[in-house]
Amino acid sequence: MSAKEWLAGFATLLGVETPTAEEIRDLLVLAGDAAHASERIAAPVACWLVARAGLSPGEARKRLEEWKEKGFARQEGEGGSKD
C-alpha cells in the first residue's frame, strides 16, 4: 500500500478529507525542521500541535519560518537531531 493510499484510508476512518499534496509537503517540511532542530520525537508532535491549534499546514509552515527568522527554532548549542 502506498503512503497516498494509507493516508486516504486513514482520513476516511477519521472522517476528514485526504490531505492535498501541498499540505503533505508543508507537514513534511515542518516535521523535518522539528526533527533536525531538536529530537526526532518533535516531528510527529509538531504535526499534532498544528492540528490541535486548528491551523492549516501552510499557516503552520509560515509561522515556523517566522519563528526561524527570529532565531527561536533552534536552541543555541544544538547541532541537530538526537536519538
Feature locations, PLM:
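An acidic intrinsically disordered interaction segment
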Residues: M1-R25
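C-terminal binding/interaction regions
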Residues: K4-T12, G58-D83
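Amphipathic, hydrophobic secondary-structure cores in small proteins
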Residues: E17-L55
